[in-house]
């Protein structure tokens, strides 16, 4: 959020997109979706040692209150529809963080029942590798997500009109 021009002693102007992005990056509310051992490290990240509140990150248990989902652990094909339903229940804008080798690429489980990376089903914004990644790695990934949010040029959603959507569908 760059300051455009100071106006006297009382006013500072800035772009509205920058202000909205600053507010969004300063209030990320991730929904925890722990599926395996990475969930333990995610819980450790939320402990007082790391103090996520100072970054505006507050864990939520409901998808309707969250704007970010952290997929932590092995995603099985049986669990995938549940994850997709939870993702669809989240309000826009929403972000996805893949935590751990299993969520990023399937990990060591190259089998018919494991999804080989959550990016096959959801648009992932940040990948955090490791087996399991340390709490500091998750914190670093969330800070990188904040950086990505600040660089977003289209803060107010898609600008595609209804007519353009209908034309592309035909």
UniProtKB/Swiss-Prot annotation:
What cellular component terms from Gene Ontology apply here? plasma membrane; respiratory chain complex I
User: GO molecular-function annotation terms?
Assistant: 4 iron, 4 sulfur cluster binding; iron ion binding; NADH dehydrogenase (ubiquinone) activity; NADH:ubiquinone reductase (non-electrogenic) activity; quinone binding
Alphabetically sorted, this entry's keywords are: 4Fe-4S, Cell inner membrane, Cell membrane, Iron, Iron-sulfur, Membrane, Metal-binding, NAD, Quinone, Translocase, Transport, Ubiquinone
- Per its UniProt record, what Gene3D superfamilies does this chain match? 3.40.50.12280
Catalysed transformations (reactions): a quinone + NADH + 5 H(+)(in) = a quinol + NAD(+) + 4 H(+)(out)
On whether Acyltransferase is a keyword of this UniProt record, the answer is no
Tell me the residue numbers annotated for binding [4Fe-4S] cluster: 37-38, 102, 131
Q: Which residues cross the membrane?
A: none
The coenzyme or cofactor needed here is: [4Fe-4S] cluster
The SS bond pairs are none
For the keyword Chaperone, the answer is no
> Which Gene Ontology terms describe the biological processes this protein takes part in?
aerobic respiration; electron transport coupled proton transport
Q: Which InterPro entries match?
A: NADH_UbQ_OxRdtase-like_20kDa, NADH_UQ_OxRdtase_20Kd_su
Q: Where in the cell is it found?
A: Cell inner membrane
Per UniProt, the enzyme's principal EC class comes to translocase
Q: How does the UniProt record describe the way this protein sits in the membrane?
A: Peripheral membrane protein
Against PANTHER family, the record matches this protein to: NADH DEHYDROGENASE, NADH DEHYDROGENASE [UBIQUINONE] IRON-SULFUR PROTEIN 7, MITOCHONDRIAL
Q: What does this protein do?
A: NDH-1 shuttles electrons from NADH, via FMN and iron-sulfur (Fe-S) centers, to quinones in the respiratory chain. The immediate electron acceptor for the enzyme in this species is believed to be ubiquinone. Couples the redox reaction to proton translocation (for every two electrons transferred, four hydrogen ions are translocated across the cytoplasmic membrane), and thus conserves the redox energy in a proton gradient.
Q: How does it assemble?
A: NDH-1 is composed of 14 different subunits. Subunits NuoB, C, D, E, F, and G constitute the peripheral sector of the complex.
- Family statement drawn from the similarity comment of this UniProt entry: Belongs to the complex I 20 kDa subunit family.
Please give the name of this protein: NADH-quinone oxidoreductase subunit B
């Amino acid at each position: 959020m760059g300051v455009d021009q100071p106006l006297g002693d009382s006013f500072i102007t800035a772009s509205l997109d920058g202000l909205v992005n600053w507010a969004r990056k300063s209030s990320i509310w991730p929904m925890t979706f722990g599926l395996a051992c990475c969930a333990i490290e995610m819980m450790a990240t939320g402990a007082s040692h790391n103090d996520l509140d100072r970054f505006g990150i507050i864990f939520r248990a409901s998808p309707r209150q969250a704007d970010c989902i952290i997929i932590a652990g092995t995603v099985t094909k049986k669990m995938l529809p549940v994850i997709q339903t939870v993702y669809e229940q989240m309000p826009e804008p929403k972000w996805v963080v893949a935590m751990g080798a299993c969520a990023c690429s399937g990990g060591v489980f190259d089998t018919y029942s494991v999804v080989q990376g959550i990016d096959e089903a959801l648009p992932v914004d940040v990948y955090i590798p490791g087996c399991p990644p340390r709490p500091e790695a998750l914190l670093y990934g969330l800070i990188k997500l904040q950086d990505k949010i600040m660089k977003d040029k289209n803060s107010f959603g898609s600008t595609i009109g209804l007519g353009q959507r209908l034309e592309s569908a035909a």
